[in-house]
């Protein structure tokens, strides 16, 4: 009931929200996001009310923040929706089937989700603190092509606020040309929830990055990585990666399943090697 009431009020005051300055918009958006989170079984009211209050306390001193455009607000909302959908998929523990399990404990699971298709879930433990993974996967995102052979290049096309970016990713061809050149345009959203960090995203449209000649524009479905300190061993990190991709084109399902499952296993191995060879961001590897 509370969520429905807020949505009704928000819809009737949309023009008023658009006239607000940046932080005012963020405060209103935060309330909507947290109400959605509560509807999905999120934290108690006191926690998110304090977060909104902290944002609101900055309004008086930063009223000159630029407005977000309608398109930027749409990207922010799309990133939030991708995160909520991906976390909802991970939250449901029923129906997952084992695809592979490595000697080091790395495990890939899969599940068919209505309106999404087959998704893959990687579960690994990395012998590095969470902050180090955050540096590599978020702050140095554009350097991923240096250490992940499955990625030729990632570029940040636009940054919106502190949590949302639009990216273009050019994937490497799979050995034997089983899967030809693909690229992805995605909206990505990064959030911290207590000791947990969530990196989420999905396909989006971006006029300044049209489809490239000779490259198939594939699409990420709701996808995310969840990072959290390993219980009882905070210097290590539990990484969960939900992968949902529509590769487009005509490809047998057996090949798609094999490629995506192996992509996750390879990613974990390459990430570990990167972290071992470049233990800190300051090293400027």
UniProtKB/Swiss-Prot annotation:
GO CC annotation: mitochondrion
Organism: Bos taurus
Molecular function per GO: cholesterol binding; cholesterol transfer activity
Keyword Glycosyltransferase: no
Protein name, UniProt field: Steroidogenic acute regulatory protein, mitochondrial
InterPro entries, A to Z: StAR, StAR-like, START-like_dom_sf, START_lipid-bd_dom
Modified residues (Phosphoserine): 57, 195
Lineage: Eukaryota, Metazoa, Chordata, Craniata, Vertebrata
Domain START: 67-280
Subcellular locations according to the entry: Mitochondrion
Pathway per the UniProt entry: Steroid metabolism; cholesterol metabolism
Lineage top rank: taxon: Eukaryota
Transmembrane regions: none
Presequence extent in this chain: 1-63
């Amino acid at each position: 009931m509370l969520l429905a009431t807020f949505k009704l009020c928000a819809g009737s005051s949309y023009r008023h929200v658009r006239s607000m300055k940046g932080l005012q918009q963020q405060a209103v958006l935060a309330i909507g996001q947290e109400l959605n989170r509560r509807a999905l079984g999120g934290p108690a009211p006191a926690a998110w009310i304090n977060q909104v209050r902290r944002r609101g306390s900055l309004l008086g001193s930063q009223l000159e923040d630029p407005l977000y455009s309608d398109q930027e607000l749409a990207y922010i909302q799309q990133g939030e929706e991708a995160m909520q959908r991906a976390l909802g998929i991970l939250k449901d523990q029923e129906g997952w089937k084992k695809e592979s399990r490595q000697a080091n404990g790395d495990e890939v699971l899969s599940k068919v989700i209505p309106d999404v298709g087959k998704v893959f879930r990687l579960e690994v433990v990395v012998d590095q603190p969470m902050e180090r993974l955050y540096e590599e996967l978020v702050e140095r995102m554009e350097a991923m092509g240096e250490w992940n052979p499955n990625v030729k290049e990632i570029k940040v096309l636009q940054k919106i606020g502190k949590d949302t970016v639009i990216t273009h990713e050019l994937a490497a061809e799979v050995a034997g040309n089983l899967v030809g050149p693909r690229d992805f345009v995605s909206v990505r959203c990064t959030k911290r929830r207590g000791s947990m960090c969530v990196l989420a995203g999905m396909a989006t449209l971006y006029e300044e990055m049209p489809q490239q000649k000779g490259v198939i524009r594939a699409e990420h479905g709701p996808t995310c990585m969840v990072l959290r300190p390993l219980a009882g061993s905070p210097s290590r990190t539990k990484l969960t990666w939900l992968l949902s991709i529509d590769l487009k084109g005509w490809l047998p399902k057996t090949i798609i399943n094999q490629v995506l499952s192996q992509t996750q296993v390879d990613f974990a191995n390459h990430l570990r090697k990167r972290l071992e060879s470049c233990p800190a961001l300051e090293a400027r590897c």
